[in-house]
Regions:
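Short loop-beta-helix segment that forms the pyridoxal 5′-phosphate
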Residues: 79-83, 93-117
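Conserved active-site segment immediately N-terminal to the catalytic lysine
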Residues: 202, 209, 222-240, 259-263
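Active-site phosphate-binding strand-loop segment of PLP-dependent enzymes
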Residues: 151, 155-207
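PLP-dependent enzyme catalytic core of the Aspartate aminotransferase-like
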Residues: 59, 63-67, 71, 98, ...
Length: 394
């Protein structure tokens, strides 16, 4: 056994939970992801999906992808920088830019590669990056790849953000990067106050709208629109893998920023471009959410009903203001156990443990879709109450 294998062989935490029968990852789904999914020959209530708009199984989205494959083929066989740009990519970028009120947008192969490529491309040794300490892992990795000076502020603590800004050279670039919706806890960034501090300290703001797009604001434009900050956020990032029912991501900003990123973001230049099917499906989903406001209304009706039911049942759900509802467990082993008990009762939820959260903040994450019914929510709450009580969590 080589040194690398010897080192990695010591990692046996997954095997420990497998032996206990509570390992919760890589569960196989045998069909489309809707509010109920086929798993192991059984129907399971799906409350672990990020498909907030409920469009992953929509026939219009599927058909758009099929038509694109027939026209363009299965892949582009190159990066956007070389032979991998389709007119379809350009159309999606133009429509995304218009949707979020920016000059231009760039599409990346995944949401993760947006953040991990854009952040180091924008900053150098003389610049500062300031992040919320609960920002997504892709933001964390993006700043790790940057040569900039890096600061973190306590979660949604605006006094601490100001303290970090005061440490910066006033004549240097200061890039504040924040999740619009925090993906595990479901709470929102305090964008109005961040914007105030932006102006006070001459900073730049980048907002990750992965969980805000399709959910907040007019037609689901995002948290920035929810707060009425149309021209105050400098860079808007989003993904296609959630509300847009596909795979990929984008960054939108003014033309000078996009021109720089188009020629300097390494994950854009050196990655194969989005597949025709993924691009066309995202474009069709974007059209649907703009043309069907009732879908956003249904999402919030389901969300508000679920929030009410979970609160009434006595769950600790924190400060969530979104379709992401954390049910706090505060114990890693019990988090896995309650996930297994819920699954055995026919409810799919996701466990959240370190490093996705602090050790004392472990939880199971419930996520709502526009297509969830009150009956499905009631059944899920009933089963989760049973699972939590069995472990003396509730």
């Amino acid at each position: 056994m080589g040194l690398l294998q010897e080192k990695l062989a010591k990692y046996d935490l997954p095997q420990k939970f497998m032996a206990q029968g509570v390992y919760p990852y890589f569960r196989e789904i045998e069909g489309k992801q809707g509010t109920e999914v086929e798993m192991g020959g059984h129907e399971v209530l799906m409350f672990g999906s990020n498909a907030y708009t409920g469009l992953t199984g929509d026939e219009r989205v599927i058909e758009a992808g099929i038509k694109a494959m027939h026209k363009y083929g299965s892949g582009c066989a190159g990066s956007r920088f070389l032979n991998g740009t389709l007119d379809l990519h350009v159309q999606l970028e133009k429509e995304l830019a218009a949707f979020v009120g920016k000059d231009e947008a760039l599409c990346f192969s995944t949401g993760f590669t947006v953040n991990s490529g854009v952040i180091p491309a924008l900053t150098d040794r003389n610049d500062y990056i300031i992040c919320d300490d609960r920002d997504h892992a892709s933001i964390v990795d993006g700043r790790r790849l940057s040569f900039s000076q890096q600061l973190k502020y306590k979660h949604n603590d605006m006094a601490d953000l100001e303290k970090q800004l005061q440490k910066c050279n006033p004549d240097s670039v200061k890039l504040i990067i924040v999740d619009g919706v925090f993906s595990m806890e479901g709470d929102l960034a305090n964008l109005p106050e961040i914007v105030r501090l932006k102006h006070k300290y001459n900073a730049t703001i980048m907002v990750d709208e992965a969980h805000g797009l399709g959910v907040f604001g007019k037609q689901g434009r995002g948290v920035w629109d929810h707060f009425g900050l149309t021209h105050e956020v400098d860079l808007i990032m989003g993904t296609f893998s959630k509300s847009l029912a596909s795979i990929g991501g984008f960054i939108a900003a003014d033309s000078s920023i996009i021109n720089w990123l188009r020629h300097n973001a390494r994950t854009y230049i050196f990655s194969a471009s989005n597949t025709p099917a993924a691009t066309a499906s995202a474009l069709e989903a974007l059209h649907i959410i703009q043309n069907e406001p009732e879908r956003l209304e249904a999402l919030w009706e389901a969300t508000n009903y679920a929030l009410k039911r979970f609160r009434e049942a006595g769950f600790e759900i924190g400060a969530t203001e979104s379709p992401i509802i954390p049910l706090y467990v505060r114990d890693t082993e019990k988090t896995f156990m309650v996930t297994k008990l819920a699954f055995d009762e026919g409810v799919f939820i996701n466990p959240v443990i370190p490093p996705a959260c602090a050790p004392q903040d472990t939880l199971v994450r419930v996520a709502l879709m526009a297509t969830h019914t009150k009956d499905q929510i009631d059944r899920a709450v009933e089963k989760l109450v049973k699972a939590f009580k069995a472990l003396d969590i509730l």
